[in-house]
């Protein structure tokens, strides 16, 4: 009974959200109008859809060009080669062609939460890519890295140009799915991307490309994670400005 009520509530809320998403997420259009070449910077194959799908789909909806730089092959269980392919498929499912996806495969940047990535090496590789592609905005994790994975956090600490970071929310909000929308709406700082129903489905389809990652707990993640439907981001320079003043 309670479950049914919850599901019904979720559906209603969602319907309302997807209808109002243009109002709710009106700011991306404005703040990102001048951006020419945004880059999504991730640590592992699957970050793009597990955490950033609403952003990716939101940007593509605005006809923004987008490319992806993934800093490891996700080789923790020796599945690097498979996971690289899964990333390409998943990006295609989201609407990013393989020509816009780059994977760094460096033995000193292993997919491993216990290894602190060498900041100089990482910075070198990322900045080279940024220059080559004339990237003017980098979108990546914030200092908490959403899941707390140290590779995610390394990315935050590495880049120095115009950067927008994905806000990590507490664990309670993280698994509220779309019920987190009112909270996100009230408290987001710069940009809010809310997926429509069809975009949510698209994100799930992209996640299905990561077959090697679909262990039982990931299915639970997919069901309840707010990051499958909602992304709130803020500009890093705003952050710095606040700290300076
Ligand atoms: C892929 O990258 C190219 C060159 O930066 C860009 O023109 C194009 O719009 C991008 N495609 C997508 C779907 O973002
Ligand atoms: Zn990751």
Please name every model-derived segment.
Residues 1-15, 160-245:
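The feature marks non-catalytic terminal segments
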Residues 1-160, 215-216, 221-223:
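Active-site beta-strand->loop->alpha-helix modules in alpha/beta enzyme cores, enriched
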């Amino acid at each position: 009974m309670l479950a049914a009520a919850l599901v019904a509530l979720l559906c209603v809320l969602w319907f309302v959200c997807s209808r109002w998403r243009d109002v709710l997420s009106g700011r991306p259009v404005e703040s990102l109008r001048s951006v020419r070449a945004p880059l999504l910077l991730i640590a592992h194959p699957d970050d793009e859809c597990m955490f950033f799908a609403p952003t990716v789909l939101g940007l593509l909806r605005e006809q923004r060009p987008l490319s992806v730089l993934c800093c490891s092959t996700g080789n923790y269980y020796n599945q690097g080669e498979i996971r690289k392919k899964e990333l390409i498929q998943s990006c295609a499912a989201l609407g990013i062609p393989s020509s816009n996806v780059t994977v760094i495969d460096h033995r000193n940047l292993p997919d491993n939460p216990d290894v602190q990535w060498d900041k100089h090496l990482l910075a070198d590789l990322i900045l080279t890519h940024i220059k080559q592609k004339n990237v003017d905005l980098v979108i990546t994790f914030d200092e908490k890295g959403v899941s707390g994975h140290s590779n995610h956090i390394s990315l935050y600490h590495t880049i120095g140009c115009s950067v927008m970071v994905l806000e990590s929310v507490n664990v309670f909000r993280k698994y509220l799915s779309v019920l987190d929308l009112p909270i996100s709406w009230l408290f987001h700082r710069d940009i809010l991307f809310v997926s429509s129903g069809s975009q949510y489905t698209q994100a799930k389809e992209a996640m299905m490309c990561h077959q090697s990652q679909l262990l039982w707990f990931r299915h639970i993640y997919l069901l309840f994670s707010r990051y499958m439907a909602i992304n709130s981001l803020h500009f890093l320079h705003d952050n710095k400005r606040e700290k300076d003043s």
